[in-house]
Amino acid sequence: MAASATTMLLKYPTTVCGIPNSSANNSTDPSNNIVQIPQTTTTNSPLLKFRTPNKPVNAVAAPAFPSVTTTTTTTPSSIQSLVKDFDPLVPAEDALTPPSSWYTEPAFYAHELDRIFYKGWQVAGYSDQVKEANQYFTGTLGNVEYLVCRDGEGKVHAFHNVCTHRASILACGSGKKSCFVCPYHGWVYGMNGSLTKASKATPEQSLNPDELGLVPLKVAVWGPFILISLDRSSREVGDVGSEWLGSCAEDVKAHAFDPNLQFINRSEFPIESNWKIFSDNYLDSSYHVPYAHKYYATELDFDTYQTDMVGNVTIQRVAGTSNNGFNRLGTQAFYAFAYPNFAVERYGPWMTTMHIVPLGPRKCKLVVDYYIEKSKLDDKDYIEKGIAINDNVQKEDVVLCESVQKGLETPAYRSGRYVMPIEKGIHHFHCWLHQVLK
């Protein structure tokens, strides 16, 4: 179990992905060393020069979703058999929880990536990360490496972060640059994904830049959130909030769309457990809190706890207390969990988001981003104490989740039972999973 330091940050941290690359350092821009591409070409040029990058790119169409390779021999029919091992029609009071294989089987995890994470909207990052032209950040979703950037015209783009020449990861971390230069063979892409230079290629090869641009992803900005979708069935972007959160969109918007909030810190927690274990833990209406989180329990008025489920969202509300002498939660805490793996929390002067990143059938990562009202920015002691309290809660949850994973791996356990009504949020989540996985 490990967690990042909680030193206060005033910008989103740089995270390195893929191969080592000096471009992860925001102070160094290798694109500054690229000669500007002229509008005309000569037949003896060692470079194949393409049109200017501000023109639209017609990149190669991406597959409906990337393939996922596993080492299991489980067949599609056996996967569906595992899905059917949970029956959503049985009343929660009598129902068995999903079998342990949902949390341990590599092929089931691959099926989840296919049916859940490669369909619909997934949070990729935050609009403040690309607030300025030429800013970018990278990330991973399953076996998909993605890149989000803002071009010189102010438009936000998302692409598969893979060079179309030899499949090298193109960019790492986050930062600001005028173009993307592949670290392998020096191919250059504009901020709109167009290929602008293929080093050492000759005009006689007839390489078509319109077929070699970065493969685009569907992208949308909704308030502070940037969302991506790998679903190629439609390139149209409609009402993103409603598509993502359904009828709960307005409730979440009322809490999250606040220009008075300032990002201050990110904490990351690697977890040796299936991603759903943390989701289950989050959705138990604080059933576990009095037993596992002694300090956090003193902050909640459990008699006021309310849990509501609509569509793919569970919203939990609870009144805060000042019994411990430090009022972190204010009068009421609001916790919205958007299935499958993202939470928006508002309490007191704080907003936190919690992103559960699946990394394998038995591994995930929790990313917690902290925001605070600007009037509190000068209160360093309050900020540091608030972050420390919440980080400690997450560390305690990591221990619980890893313990559950170990138990699920044993022959002693196959399925459990729900305690109702306090675990109705978990049951609702499991029914949603069954619906999208069948």
From Swiss-Prot:
Keyword hit for Metal-binding: yes
Tissues expressing the protein: Expressed in roots and leaves.
Transit peptide: 1-58
Superkingdom, taxonomy of origin: Eukaryota
Binding site for [2Fe-2S] cluster: 163, 165, 182, 185
Cofactor binding notes: Binds 1 [2Fe-2S] cluster.
Localization (cell): Plastid, Chloroplast stroma
Enzyme Commission no: 1.14.15.7
Co-factor requirement: [2Fe-2S] cluster; Fe cation; Mg(2+)
Record's catalysed reaction(s): choline + 2 reduced [2Fe-2S]-[ferredoxin] + O2 + 2 H(+) = betaine aldehyde hydrate + 2 oxidized [2Fe-2S]-[ferredoxin] + H2O
Record-listed Fe cation binding positions: 288, 293
Ranges for domain Rieske: 121-228
A GO CC term assigned to this protein in UniProt: chloroplast stroma
PANTHER family, per database record: CHOLINE MONOOXYGENASE, CHLOROPLASTIC
Function: Catalyzes the first step of the osmoprotectant glycine betaine synthesis.
Designated name of the protein: Choline monooxygenase, chloroplastic
